[in-house]
Design a protein with these regions (language model features):
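Conserved Rossmann-fold NAD(P)-dependent oxidoreductase catalytic core, especially the SDR/UDP-sugar
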Residues: 71, 75-133, 141-142
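A short helix-to-beta-strand connector/capping loop
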Residues: 38-45, 144-146
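Residues forming the Rossmann-fold NAD(P)(H) cofactor-binding site
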Residues: 2, 6
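NAD(P)H-binding glycine-rich loop region in Rossmannoid oxidoreductase-like domains
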Residues: 7-13, 17-18, 34, 40, ...
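Hydrophobic/aromatic anchor residues within beta-strands of the central parallel beta-sheet
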Residues: 46, 90, 113, 148-151
Length: 169
């Protein structure tokens, strides 16, 4: 998500709000952007929120008018299947939170909704791939009332959580 945020920031948007459950990720993205690009005229803010939370719902109700919503959230590692508690969280994040943000986007008149998926959704052999495949089915169903696009990505070299990223650290 940081690379996407930087690309959007460089285009001087009127409003760029970034939501991530990790406060540390938000601090890092702001530091990186400020040191690389400085400031924009638009409204750039970060929010350390869980999309599944009541606080996120209040945030959307307070300022939920967005032309574009990019949902880049995911529990994307097969190791997240190791216990039933993390597995339940994976289903919440990958399926139910996606459905929630699509519904909120449709209700608020969002022009375009984008959601990232994985190559593992093509022919799922594990719960992570299956959860993303189910998410894609929700995307297809919701596309009747919301302009939606999605892309399947394989593991991206040096992305957060990848093996190559750990070497870079």
């Amino acid at each position: 998500g940081q690379a996407v945020t930087k690309e959007i920031f460089k285009r001087n948007p009127k409003k760029l709000h970034v939501v991530d459950i990790s406060e540390n990720n938000m601090v890092e993205v702001v530091r990186d952007i400020r040191s690389s690009f400085g400031y924009i005229d638009g409204d750039f803010q970060t929010f350390a929120l869980d999309i599944g939370s009541l606080e996120y719902d209040a945030f959307i109700k307070a300022d939920g008018q967005y032309d574009y919503v990019l949902n880049l959230s995911a529990l994307k590692h097969v190791r997240s299947e190791k216990d039933p508690f993390t597995l339940m969280r994976m289903i919440d994040v990958n399926i139910f939170n996606t459905e929630k943000t699509m519904r909120q986007s449709a209700e608020s008149g969002t022009k375009k909704y984008f959601c990232v998926s994985t190559d593992k959704a093509a022919n799922p052999v594990n719960m992570m791939g299956a959860s993303k495949r189910i998410m894609e089915m929700f995307l297809i169903r919701r596309s009747i009332d919301l302009n939606i696009s999605t892309a399947r990505f394989a593991n991206v070299a040096f992305s957060d959580g990848s093996l190559l990223h750990s070497f870079d650290q």
